[in-house]
Amino acid sequence: MKTSTKTFAIADTAANADYLTNTSEPLGETMTLNVGPSHPATHGVLRLVLELDGEEIISCDPVVGHLHRGMEKIGETIQYNQFVPYTDRFDYLAPLSNNIAYACAVEKLLGWELPPRGQALRVLALELSRFSSHILGVGVYGMDVGAMTVFLYCYEEREKIHNFYEQLTGARFTSSYTRIGGQTRDVPNEMLKEVLVFCDEAAKTLDETEALLLKNKIFIDRLQGVGVISREKALSWGITGANLRASGIKRDLRKLTPYLGYENYEFDVPVGEHGDCYDRFTVRIEEMRQSLRIIRQVIETMPDGPINMVDTKGTLPEKKKVLTDMESLIRQFMTTTMGVNAPAGQVYFAAENPKGELGFFLDSKGGGLPNRLRMRSPSFCNLSILPELMKGHLVSDVPAILGSFDFVMGECDR
């Protein structure tokens, strides 16, 4: 903590004491306060350098990069399929969302389209990830502003989704589920029945969470009118996802540029009115309800058929064929050792992830490695507004504002 070298003496006279108590003029001294990079309110290794006049924030300087691992450069030195496990480590709270967005970008470069069942499986995984990310964000946000009980309810639902991850992918956290042209395994039929039961239970938990928090005057007062982002500012700063929709802009890539068959499912896009912390919270609550709605439709309309591209050069054959068919064995060997032979070209694919618009730009000169891999991080773009947004707020508002953005530093720093 750094303070000014000037000495501030409090006068003994009643007149001066009254002036110091009631004046709104700056006192002429500021204090520099470091929040993070190791602080529970920053939700990761984010550092904020705040300049304070009393309790009022005069300036905010976000410092990112503490979790930078050179992911984009790594992606340019390994095969397309080999990069899938690295995408788990971007938004590690919704790893399947990153897997699928990256795989879709490469498939767009290749000109591939998954069979209907493969697309439906990915939509199921995406919406489970969205719910998992949002329910954790809502629970942790309650703790940020002093509501501990809600976190326990929310974490219980997230734990159920991790059980589904384990059934679907074999892993609870960093799943590496997708492959270029498909995914590692089909969904167990028993799991689909369990997910339908979960949807009913999770809907009740959302109602309870809403009742606990949105009928709590202290919680509401901590959020309403705090961290307001206008429509114009949200667009000019490149904010996306629930944070953008909370400012009243109805932009959802699942509706705007449908992918993986999202146009076949009915769901609403919730928006806010004021763009404050309260709206960002309520939009996420409603988005979870819409995710449950999509999940039910996916299961009820799940088509039969293959989950991967069939007999396509560059995709892995079925394991049982590898054991009995020479051509399949050769194809697996060539795909594993040489990778996908992508054509020359450039593509950009963007997905509506829990944190916002996650985009991948690929520049290919041909062959098994990309010439350039660039990732658009929604958390990085959303946090860019902090220097402007924090000004004029109190120190006590910092956890409320940061928590309302629901960011993750693994994806921000890459």
Curated annotation (Swiss-Prot):
Localisation per UniProt entry: Cell inner membrane
Regions that span the bilayer: none
Membrane topology per record: Peripheral membrane protein
EC number: 7.1.1.-
Keywords recorded for this protein, A-Z: Cell inner membrane, Cell membrane, Membrane, NAD, Quinone, Translocase, Transport, Ubiquinone
First-listed, main subcellular location of the protein, grouped into a coarse class: membrane
Disulfide bonds: none
Family membership noted in the UniProt record: Belongs to the complex I 49 kDa subunit family.
Function noted in UniProt: NDH-1 shuttles electrons from NADH, via FMN and iron-sulfur (Fe-S) centers, to quinones in the respiratory chain. The immediate electron acceptor for the enzyme in this species is believed to be ubiquinone. Couples the redox reaction to proton translocation (for every two electrons transferred, four hydrogen ions are translocated across the cytoplasmic membrane), and thus conserves the redox energy in a proton gradient.
Name of the featured protein: NADH-quinone oxidoreductase subunit D
Lineage: Bacteria, Pseudomonadati, Verrucomicrobiota, Verrucomicrobiia, Verrucomicrobiales
